[in-house]
């Protein structure tokens, strides 16, 4: 199955002509200007939608889809995810990763001591924070900074970290 990445969530309708307010889950909402198609995940099926128009309002993206011209045709999709294929995703700079690819990495210390699995990435504004769940069910919060994150290897599904004093009880 092809990897799909979530770029937004339909939060509400906008007007009566089929437009929707989308809460973007990407760090740059201007990326929506470059998109031609998105996949709507209805929960039961996935529908390809062609983007006809893109506008911005506060922290939202306003999208108009081709062939959807009525509020009644789109209202039922509130809360549903908008996805794109990996090939339509933006190119990332070195050291940048899709959160989707990081979830599930096995975290270990520099000496090889296993810590657990990366289960979540918190976006704090200053820097991201990796949530590592240990085998004992505890959580370790690792800031995504050079002092702490030493290596990310997606091929080996491994995250190597340096635990600075105070990160673990």
Swiss-Prot record:
GO terms for cellular component: cytoplasm; ribosome. Residues 94-167 form the PRC barrel domain. One of its GO terms (molecular function) is ribosome binding. It is found in: Cytoplasm. Its main location: cytoplasm. Pfam families: PRC_RimM, RimM. GO terms for biological process: ribosomal small subunit biogenesis; rRNA processing. InterPro entries: PRC_barrel-like_sf (IPR011033), PRC_RimM (IPR056792), RimM (IPR011961), RimM_N (IPR002676), RimM_N_sf (IPR036976), Transl_B-barrel_sf (IPR009000). Keywords: Chaperone, Cytoplasm, Ribosome biogenesis, rRNA processing. SUPFAM superfamilies: PRC-barrel domain (SSF50346), Translation proteins (SSF50447). Binds ribosomal protein uS19. HAMAP family: Ribosome_mat_RimM. The PRC barrel domain binds ribosomal protein uS19. An accessory protein needed during the final step in the assembly of 30S ribosomal subunit, possibly for assembly of the head region. Essential for efficient processing of 16S rRNA. May be needed both before and after RbfA during the maturation of 16S rRNA. It has affinity for free ribosomal 30S subunits but not for 70S ribosomes. Belongs to the RimM family. This is Ribosome maturation factor RimM. The lineage of its organism: Bacteria, Bacillati, Bacillota, Clostridia, Lachnospirales.
């Amino acid at each position: 199955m092809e990897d799909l990445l979530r770029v937004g969530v339909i939060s509400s309708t906008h007007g009566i002509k089929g437009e929707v307010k989308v809460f973007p889950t990407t760090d740059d909402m201007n990326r929506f200007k470059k998109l031609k198609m998105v996949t709507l995940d209805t929960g039961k099926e996935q529908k390809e939608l062609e983007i006809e128009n893109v506008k911005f309002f506060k922290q939202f993206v306003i999208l108009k889809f081709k062939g959807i011209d009525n509020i009644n045709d789109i209202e039922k999709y509130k809360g549903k995810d908008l996805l794109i294929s990996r090939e339509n995703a933006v190119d990332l700079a070195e050291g940048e990763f899709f959160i989707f690819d990081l979830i599930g990495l096995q975290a270990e210390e520099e000496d090889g001591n296993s810590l657990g699995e990366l289960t979540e990435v918190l976006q704090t504004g200053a820097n991201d924070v990796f949530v590592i769940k240990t085998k004992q069910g505890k959580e370790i919060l690792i800031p995504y900074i050079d002092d702490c994150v030493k290596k990310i290897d997606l091929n080996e599904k491994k995250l190597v970290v340096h635990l600075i004093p105070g990160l673990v009880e």
